[in-house]
Amino acid sequence: MGRLVKESIAFQNTTFFDELTLAFDEVKNLKETDVGDSEPIYRISKIIKNHTNLNITIDAENDYPPCIDIPNIDRNNPLINAAQRAIVNSTDGLTMIESSNEVLHGTVNIKTAKVSGVFSDIKAKMYLGKAFIQGNKYSSQELAAITLHEVGHLFTYFEFITRTVRTNQVLAGLSKILDGSENQEKREVALLSAKKALKLDKLDLSQLKDVNTKTTQVVLIDALVKETRTELGYNLFAESSWEYLCDQFSARHGAGVHLATALSKIYKSNYNISYRSLAVYLAVEMIKVILISNLAFLGILFLVVMLDSQDGGGYDLPSARLKRIRDQATQYLKNKQISDVERRRILDEIESIDKLLAEMTNRKQLFTYIHEFFSKRTRDERAYRKLQYELEDIAMNDLYVKAAEFKLMGNT
């Protein structure tokens, strides 16, 4: 996934995940009427604050599914897709700037998975419906994994704000130098500094030798956009990028396998097409064909097709999503410094995820096949996804898993 993955958070220890799990153990022992205003729920907010410095309050009074209300800081954040951008704004961010008597400062540390400064002051609300978090459907570990995923939404949102601000600062500084200097040598030094700061290794500075400041800014921004694409030429900020980064945030805190089992339960409860037997799959598709033959049922058909769709919504296909969570475990095995106990734990998690993947299929709706046949863009996107997944398989192949197994055998 190009630069996006290279700047992901580092692998963390499991303390954050373990503390969340213990808090959910206590939540499960409460009466449903007592959950919303309980000490364990407040403690979840404190645990999040302690490990990330993020200021997140938990709302367990309602029955919303797990989600986080992202503050309206910057509607132009690259992680927000075009459809979302049409209905969000930057009011919170503008209010912060207008009400502050000094320059706002903040950092996002991807090595420690912590924020500081203004990012630790911004308030956000996470919804964990009491009906969802109680009962026996989801274990405390699965709830902790889901919570980490939602925390990841806010963390990565702030991370991409810092990237945008960094770019703006470089461009502003460059403009000031270029506007105030006719000296060609100073221009070249300034452009070279901007190239290094923005990590535009492939940019040819000779094309900027005799152009004005505004054109220079346009060229640099265009180069940055191209840098956000993968080597395959597909936009890096695809709809699934944000969800993928949040899954990764959870997995890199040691919750990968529990996130995978939670997702499997969610997919099954939604009767996802990936879990249907051949007989059920064919029966459902036949019903859709029958509905399309009757104009009176077209509205119902549209609803059924939308609910049954595997496309859009910002998520990978179920099997691809679990496979990418598995890849995080494989990536961790590349660390030669981990203990045999850790290595055994990761291998067990990979085995568990493999069992979940074995239950899935990659079936698509009949209407999806028809759409792909008539839409070249859709075919190209499917081909890109397939190639991207194949390249990821090469990078995260099972040689690392087998090597870890042999290492354990050699140490026994």
Region spans (language model):
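Catalytic Zn2+-binding segment of zinc metalloproteases
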Residues: 141, 148-173, 180, 185-189, ...
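Hydrophobic alpha-helical membrane segments
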Residues: 157, 165, 172, 226, ...
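A metal-dependent hydrolase signature that marks the N-terminal structural subdomain at the beginning
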Residues: 1-99
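Short helix/loop segments within enzyme catalytic domains
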Residues: 182-281
